[in-house]
C-alpha cells in the first residue's frame, strides 16, 4: 500500500526534514538557511507528484494562518456603502500581500463564546480588523489584554489602535460655509451613535453654536427611518440644514420638493459619506467622503507590516475634504 502523500513523505523523498519542506513551500524566512540545492530538490519532488500541502500542515509548521479576519462588530447596517467599500479594499490589499480575508459578523453569541479570541488560539487568523466598533464592544479590551494584533476601522474607541477619516473639521467647514453665505436659522440632523457621528456633531456645534441651532437626533439615520426627523427640521423654518449623513440629507431634499422649498435658493443643504445616490438625486448634495477605501487600504498595509516586520499598530487619521455640489455650491465657482 502506498504511503500517504504529506509533508513527511515529501521530506523523505527530498532527503530533508519536514520543517525544511514547510519553510520552502511557505516561503517563510528563518534564521536557519536553506541551500538552493535543497530548495530545488523539494520543489522538484512536489512538482513531480503534483503535491499541494494541507493548509493545516502549513499552519502547523509555519505557525501562521495567512488569513486576516474582517469583523463587522455588530449585526446592524450590513448594507452600508462604506462597509462594502472597506471590505473590498481590505480583500484586495491583503491578497496583493499574500494574505486572505475571513469575513466575520459580530453577535452576542460570537462574543459570549469568545470567538474573537478563539480564532487566534485555533490559528485560524493572524490578525483582526474590526469595522464599526463602539464603546459597548468590550471584547476589544479582551483582545488588548490577550496581546493579539487588531486594528479598528472607521470608528475610534478609547485607546484602541484605529484607522479613521477626520470628520469633526469637515463638518465645521461645511457648517461655517453656510454661515458665511448668510444662514442664521440653522438646523442639524445628527446622531451620537459611535465616534464618527459624535465627531460630526462636535464639528457642527463648534460652528453653529453662536446661532442657537435646532438639533434633531436619530440613531443610524437610515433613509427609511429619518423622514420624521426631516419633517421636524423643516418645521423649524431653517435656512440651512446640516445632516450627519447623506441619507438624512436625501430625506430633507425629498420633503423640500413636496413642500415647494427650493435648494439652494431657499435652503442650503449638506450631507456626509458621499453615497452614490447623493450625486444623482434631483439636486446633487454637497457632502464629503469618509475615505472608506483609503482607510481600509492603510489598515491592511499596517496589519501586514506589523505581522511581517513588527511595525507597531498605531492610530492613524486620514484627512477629508468637501465635495461641492448643487445643494451648497462652491463659492465663486472655484
Walk through the language-model features, giving the residues of each.
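N-terminal helix-turn-helix DNA-binding module of bacterial transcription factors
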Residues: 1-63
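Alpha-helical recognition/docking segments in bacterial nutrient-uptake
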Residues: 2, 6, 63-176, 180, ...
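Short beta-strand segments enriched in small/hydrophobic residues
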Residues: 20-22, 60-77, 185-191
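Short beta-strand elements in bilobed, periplasmic/extracellular small-molecule ligand-binding domains
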Residues: 94-106, 186-188, 205-225
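Periplasmic-binding protein-like
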Residues: 124-132, 185-190, 216, 235-248, ...
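Hydrophobic alpha-helical segments within soluble ligand-binding/sensing domains
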Residues: 162-188, 198, 223-231, 249, ...
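An alpha-beta-alpha
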Residues: 174-214, 312-328
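Flexible loop/turn connectors
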Residues: 230-334
Amino acid at each position: 500500500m502506498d504511503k500517504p502523500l504529506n509533508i513527511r513523505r515529501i521530506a523523505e523523498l527530498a532527503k530533508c526534514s519536514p520543517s525544511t519542506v514547510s519553510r520552502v513551500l511557505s516561503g517563510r524566512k528563518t534564521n536557519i538557511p536553506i541551500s538552493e540545492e535543497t530548495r530545488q530538490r523539494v520543489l522538484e519532488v512536489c512538482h513531480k507528484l503534483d503535491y499541494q500541502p494541507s493548509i493545516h500542515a502549513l499552519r502547523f509548521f509555519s505557525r501562521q494562518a495567512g488569513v486576516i479576519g474582517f469583523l463587522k462588530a455588530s449585526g446592524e447596517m450590513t448594507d452600508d456603502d462604506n462597509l462594502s467599500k472597506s471590505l473590498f479594499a481590505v480583500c484586495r490589499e491583503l491578497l496583493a500581500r499574500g494574505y486572505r480575508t475571513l469575513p466575520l459578523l459580530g453577535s452576542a453569541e460570537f462574543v459570549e463564546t469568545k470567538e474573537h479570541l478563539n480564532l487566534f488560539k485555533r490559528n485560524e487568523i493572524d490578525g483582526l480588523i474590526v469595522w464599526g466598533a463602539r464603546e459597548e464592544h468590550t471584547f476589544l479590551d479582551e483582545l488588548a489584554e490577550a496581546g493579539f494584533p487588531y486594528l479598528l476601522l472607521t470608528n475610534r474607541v478609547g485607546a484602541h489602535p484605529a484607522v479613521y477619516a477626520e470628520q469633526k473639521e469637515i463638518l465645521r467647514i461645511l457648517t461655517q460655509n453656510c454661515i458665511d453665505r448668510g444662514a442664521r436659522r440653522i438646523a442639524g440632523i445628527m446622531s451620537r451613535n459611535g465616534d464618527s457621528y459624535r465627531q460630526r456633531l462636535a464639528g457642527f456645534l463648534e460652528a453653529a453654536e453662536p446661532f442657537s441651532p435646532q438639533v434633531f437626533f436619530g440613531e443610524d439615520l437610515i433613509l427609511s427611518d429619518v423622514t420624521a426627523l426631516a419633517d421636524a427640521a423643516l418645521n423649524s423654518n431653517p435656512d440651512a440644514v446640516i445632516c450627519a449623513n447623506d441619507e438624512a440629507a436625501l430625506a430633507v431634499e425629498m420633503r423640500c420638493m413636496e413642500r415647494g422649498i427650493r435648494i439652494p435658493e431657499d435652503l442650503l443643504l449638506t450631507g456626509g459619506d458621499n453615497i452614490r445616490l447623493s450625486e444623482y438625486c434631483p439636486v446633487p448634495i454637497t457632502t464629503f467622503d469618509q475615505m472608506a477605501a483609503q482607510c481600509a487600504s492603510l489598515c491592511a498595509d499596517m496589519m501586514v507590516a506589523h505581522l511581517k516586520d513588527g511595525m507597531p499598530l498605531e492610530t492613524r487619521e486620514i484627512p477629508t475634504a468637501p465635495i461641492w455640489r448643487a445643494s451648497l455650491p462652491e463659492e465663486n465657482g472655484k
